[in-house]
Amino acid sequence: MTRIRTNRWQRAAGALAALALVAGACGGDDDTADAPADAPAEAPAEEPAEEPAEEPAEEPAEEPAEEPAEEVEVTQDGGILAAVQARGVLNCGVSGAAVAFSYTDADGSMNGIDADYCRAVAAAVLGDADAVEFTSLTAAERFTAVQTGAVDVLMRNSTWTQSRDTEVGMDFGPTTYYDGQQLMARASDDFTGQSSVEEIDGAIVCTNAGTTTETNISELAAELGISITLNTFEDYDQVTDAFIAGTCDVITTDGSGLVGRKAVQEPEDQSWVIFPATPISKEPLGPVYAQNDSQWADVVNWTVYATLIADENGVTSADVDDALAGEFGAEMVRLLGGEGEKQTFMGLSADAFYNVISQVGNYQEIWDANLTPVGLDRTGSANALWTDGGLMYPPPAR
């Protein structure tokens, strides 16, 4: 039942499309993967009809200002959850070009960690991980799609920033991938994995337009007193193509995006190196949804938490029945829909998170399916569980 669509949201965006200039990135949000490390600012949601809509304040350079967005689809209950349940399909915004995060495979299927979190939400809400319609969105399009209600949730390696969370008028869910911006160059140009940013002085640097990546590298170059020529492109396929052709000396985006591109696009006659060893920015990536819908926020957030709680407890898709029977403790019994469950208080079925783990997997399983194949190691990273020295620390299911 999984479906993929591209730019259908533009019919809903209408006049907003002209103002959806560029929105920040997954360098934190480029299309590297579209690259994480795969972000922009937009206007607050439109006021009720009787209230005149105000022009939003001008956004920072990396965030385009937009007109107030149309209200999201509502039902009698007035929320996104009810709308999705009535529709029977989750509309999920993704990149469609971000290696390991969301990319369209040769068979037309959407793959990656972001795509799998779309499936996880569909499993929680509808009981079917395949009840998803994917919408591929550029960095400039993504936040307008959230504001207009063209997508129910955005899983597009988008960086959580103050301006996006406040001025643009959206809400961010739990971080699903802690990333950081890095650079990539050719070893033949005397770069190594230990190179510093100062070494790109005089270089032609390429990245996505309208992303946090673009802003970060511009600000850092000014702080370091180095001169770069910054060329930007609409999507990261164009960035990588220009790099392969020799038009760019250096490309930059989220580190995870660079790792993904290197894994699948490095020519045999070239050696690409990623640097500096310590990323130049923080790029927390995760779900984005319309603001002021607490019920929907709870659903999306606890879907993410469920994958992490299962990971904490060592419960995989193969163990859910044993966990529901109590073999992994009382918390997992509650989480999977047994005695003391809390899912029905959220407007979901008691077995909502049973469906998530059984159909999609826990966080480690999602990681192994999408990130391990391109060489991203969770061990020792910020994405490890808190018990292993990482930042993944879900609240308890009780």
PLM regions: where:
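Bacterial lipoprotein signal-peptidase II cleavage site
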Residues: 27-37
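Extracytoplasmic small-molecule ligand-binding "clamshell" domains
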Residues: 74-154, 348, 385, 389
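C-terminal motif of bacterial Sec signal peptides marking the signal peptidase cleavage site
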Residues: 20-25
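Short helix-initiation/N-cap motifs at beta->coil->alpha
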Residues: 77, 132-144, 192, 230-245
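Bilobed "Venus flytrap"/periplasmic-binding protein-like clamshell domains
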Residues: 91-100, 110-125, 159, 179-241, ...
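Bacterial N-terminal signal peptides that target proteins for export
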Residues: 3-13
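Extended ligand-binding regions for polar small-molecule ligands
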Residues: 71-75, 123-125, 187-191, 204, ...
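Acidic, polar ligand-binding/catalytic clefts
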Residues: 119, 123, 127, 131-199, ...
